Amino acid sequence: MDTPDSASRVFCGRFLSMVNTDDVNAIILAQKNMLDRFEKTNEMLLNFNNLSSVRLQQMSERFMHHTRTLVDMKRDLDSIFRRIRTLKGKLARQHPEAFSHIPEGSFLEDEDEDPIPPSITTTIATSEQSTGSCDTSPDTVSPSLSPGFEDLSHIQPGSPAINGHRQTDDEEETHEE
């Protein structure tokens, strides 16, 4: 009888003869090609990820800058409209007959219907470490600071006027119609 060494050798020899070395080499080559492709793809994805994170940071900064600008503009416009309402109220108290045909609610409006949500201002305040915005607008409106401001101080109280000129009876009738 054959020895156990010879039986195992025969079995291994037959098992190895069943495997085609060309097929094994082709599989190894295909695996190397796939590995190269995966490494290149991985490198491209890493580059894309890095580029995307840089762009996201840039766009986030721009978005925050534009958001701050819009919030500042809204705050400035609110201040301007509040001043206009205050001036209208003062003029209405000083010259009630000039404002008699205008309903009181139309020139003494409350704050806007859509105020800035606190979450936006909180987000802006917490996301930046700035010294704050500088409000250069004056607290009171004066003729010397506001170009185009019409000085109405020379008009006598109780006389309706448009553009600094007193109206005649004929003109009043045409403006009331």
Curated annotation (Swiss-Prot):
One Gene Ontology term from the biological process aspect of the record: regulation of lysosome size
Stretches with biased composition (Polar residues): 125-145
Region ranges (Disordered): 100-177
Domain of life: Eukaryota
Any one Gene Ontology cellular component term annotated for this protein: BORC complex
Disruption phenotype: Show defects in the lysosome-related organelles (LRO) biogenesis, mimicking mildly the human Hermansky-Pudlak syndrome (HPS).
Keyword vocabulary terms for this entry: Acetylation, Lysosome, Membrane
Pfam families recorded: KxDL (PF10241)
Residue list for modification N-acetylmethionine: M1
Tissues where this protein is expressed: Widely expressed.
Annotated compartments: Lysosome membrane
Record text on subunit structure and interactions: Component of the BLOC-one-related complex (BORC) which is composed of BLOC1S1, BLOC1S2, BORCS5, BORCS6, BORCS7, BORCS8, KXD1 and SNAPIN. Associates with the BLOC-1 complex. Interacts with BLOC1S1. Interacts with DTNBP1/BLOC1S7 (via coiled-coil domain).
Biological role stated in the UniProt entry: As part of the BORC complex may play a role in lysosomes movement and localization at the cell periphery. Associated with the cytosolic face of lysosomes, the BORC complex may recruit ARL8B and couple lysosomes to microtubule plus-end-directed kinesin motor. May also be involved in the biogenesis of lysosome-related organelles such as melanosomes.
Family the UniProt entry places it in: Belongs to the KXD1 family.
Name under which the protein is recorded: KxDL motif-containing protein 1
Organism this protein belongs to: Mus musculus (Mouse)
